[in-house]
Amino acid sequence: MSDYKPTLNLPDTDFPMRGDLAKREPAMLKRWQDMDLYQKVRDVTKGRKSFILHDGPPYANGSIHIGHAVNKILKDIIVKSKTVSGFDAPYIPGWDCHGLPIEHKVEQLIGKAGTKVSYKEFRAKCREYAYTQIEEQKKDFIRLGVMGDWENPYLTMNFQTEANIVRALGKIAENGHLVKGFKPVYWSVVGGSALAEAEVEYQDKTSLSLDVRYAPQDEAALLAKFSAVEGEGKVSVVIWTTTPWTLPASQAVSIHPEFNYALVEVDMGLGKERLILAEDMVASVMSRYGVTDFRIVGRTVGAELAGTVLNHPFLQRDIPVILGEHVTTEAGTGCVHTAPDHGVDDFNVGRENGIGTINLVQDNGVYSDAAGEFAGLHVYKVDDAVLEALNRNNALVFESKIFHSYPHCWRTKTPLIFRATPQWFISMTKEGLLDSAKHAVEGVKWVPSWGQNRMEGMLNNSPDWCVSRQRTWGVPIALFINKETQELHPETPRLIEEVAKRIEVEGIDAWFEMEAEELLGADAEKYSKVTDTLDVWFDSGVTHYSVIDQRDELSFPADLYLEGSDQHRGWFQSSLKTSIAIRGVPPYKQVLTHGFTVDGDGRKMSKSLGNVLSPQKVMDTLGADIIRLWVAATDYTTEMTVSDEILKRVADSYRRIRNTARFMMANLNGFNPATDMVPAKDMIALDRWIVDRAALLQKELNTAYNEYQFHTVNQKIQNFCSVDLGGFYLDVIKDRQYTTQKDSLARRSAQTALYHVIEAFSRWIAPILSFTADEIWQTLPGERGESVFLETWYEGLEELTGDEAMGREFWKQVLEAKVATNKVLEAARSEGKMKASLSADITLYCDDALQTTLNRLGEELRFVLIASDVKVLPLSQAGEDAVATDLDGLKVHVELSKYTKCVRCWHHREEVGKRDAHPELCDRCISNLPDGEGEQRLYA
């Protein structure tokens, strides 16, 4: 038996079958860093139309989690897809560096500022700590394959950025939006500071629920306000509260002017008494009390009760009944205990009625001496003392526990209180900021589109923004206030600029260490220097001004902001408000949001559940490209499900892409595009078709990338690999690739097609599978640039014109016939009739149209169907042994070839064994030997 293997063109490539990504990716990263790839991309794209994706800064504390990975990968996919689409798309990563979590960490290390260490030392340690956290996070982001200016990120603690944050505050003040007020704000007793809406998250909490009696000072006068009064027993107004700690600050009871109120006779264990409740609430309240024996003995309307004076349940304090539109009948009794210190509605209705605040709770949540018997107690631990006071005065009607959603600090995860304090606010109404922001939302493109409704909903409920914090590590509110008038210094714009210039040199210490006399001279004694710091949401919210405006490679407004869906209430909103306040226009043209990551069971990831999936671990085992492919393959507009099992499936789909690329490159063995490329007009028809398919797909992918439909990109690429290439084209060309002469048109045409496709393919996957794409790029034949990321969409894909006899519709019909025939072949194989399709002779019984189509391929139809012999006959000649297929107008008969197999091409042909020189070969293979005439192909 002769060895004909040397006469075959066997595939060969240095591109390994196994990705081994966890080991191979770090070397690729080092190569990118050594060649300064990001700067090379900037140089290549300079002068193109820009696309600015502005990075929402993660907080500089702790290791990155899978949510961080999702966010950064989505951004990277967009930046890279814009670059390959012909844009100049710089990416400047950023970090949010000030605020409470870092203060807490530093306190654990060196103690509290002002006690254990000086404030200046404390700030220096905070800065140092933030830098260490940034470096750790940066390493992981880079390891994910995210390309950006990692050597020059923006940090909100950079001196220049801190100075520009102060300047932004000055602009907002100059435009009339900054006001000082005394209002209840969310207050963290752990942090000792105010919080803005964006820093609040709701968690379930069990609270003590109390119904409390407020007795009237003049019972007869109160009863006179009711009609047809009956019954007996003492009278009291009943309030319901889930915050017993606010009762010492109770100063009024609010009722709704238009609600009907009932006098209810009932025995709650102290004998008969008469309770005043909203009439609509009587049934539900009595049910809650577990009481069935009660009756309504009088009625009135809320407005009639205004002015009634009640006694505080356990303090010597007059409690007026006041009217408030905020009162509802959704829960409680319809009578609302009102503490202006501890609620926005309470504060507002109190102010309308001339009731101020009494400030019984200190910064740390402990009652002051003015709270009498509660002095020194913490608001979290006062329930028992309040209960004792109520019981002592027979004021407790009913006690229970309630499980409800309660505001918590998003950083410390501890419950918050409302507390009235003097604070700085960005007013939503003084200069029409809120209305302007609502109007601006309409001009922004929201992805998904429901983001617009969500943002509008957030704005509709948006109070004045409390931007002041009582912290040490933060950008200062660098203002001077007149001690008498409480007005800003008349030269505030000039003073802001003076301070900003100093901060550029010394950082925020410049303000905190500065004496007022240095700027104000003799006027210093008339002014007080504000010691508050800015909300960190202000820091990040003004980066459109403090960063985008300051970096030459960026431009305002940004084309895109992209963050998690929680940022409608966070960064998207703070950025919008500050941009409108400074410039009157939104800071972004488009806003894209992604969902949160959950485990395979749809549960939020948490250490307590043990379901946290570490991106670092995945990178060290499967590789970053697997995480990147998972992100692209997942619909980011909803919750993003991830688990080890899901990532294994992603790894399987990755292998399909890798193996497809490897097959194409292996079959480019010996191909030099400079000398071996076949012009389109001379290419085999099937090869022209696959290039046309790639050209059409490239357009579709470009559209999908531009619309941020990355799961569509993935689906289309996977489909191209499994259907167009793996399921058809690559199978068909194997014979031509392996068996025709090395330099034949038949082989070089297929190699030309493969070269065009893989050139395009490497660019298609580059935004998603960045490591793999550049690995492919380094393996491709021919002269090329240093990296795939320096390229744009491949321009060598030539579409079919539509005039060809073998155009798109022709190949569509051929492919349909092949799929239908393959099912019959597969059935024959599974029944044991044959082992391989090449051992089959096939007869196709076709209707006239299909017969005409398939006959155009002539003898080459057998190569398309990968069979040894194919006949095409009229459908009318089909016998009972012909199998009907899914394709109308086609029946198929398959039988085992009676001829001997050619040892070189494995086709079964009549002439095998009849040629003395090469008895084991078919005539075609004899012709394709190096000294033969060579086979001619036209179609397949």
Swiss-Prot record:
The free-text note explaining how the cofactor binds reads: Binds 1 zinc ion per subunit.
Keyword Cell cycle tagged: no
Q: Which GO terms describe its molecular function?
A: aminoacyl-tRNA deacylase activity; ATP binding; isoleucine-tRNA ligase activity; tRNA binding; zinc ion binding
| Cellular compartments annotated | Cytoplasm
Q: Which GO terms describe its cellular component?
A: cytosol
By sequence similarity, the record places it as follows: Belongs to the class-I aminoacyl-tRNA synthetase family. IleS type 1 subfamily.
Q: What does this protein do?
A: Catalyzes the attachment of isoleucine to tRNA(Ile). As IleRS can inadvertently accommodate and process structurally similar amino acids such as valine, to avoid such errors it has two additional distinct tRNA(Ile)-dependent editing activities. One activity is designated as 'pretransfer' editing and involves the hydrolysis of activated Val-AMP. The other activity is designated 'posttransfer' editing and involves deacylation of mischarged Val-tRNA(Ile).
Query: What is the name of the protein in this document?
Result: Isoleucine--tRNA ligase
- This chain's source organism reads Marinomonas sp. (strain MWYL1)
Query: In the record, what lineage is assigned to the organism producing the protein?
Result: Bacteria, Pseudomonadati, Pseudomonadota, Gammaproteobacteria, Oceanospirillales
Q: Which gene encodes it?
A: ileS
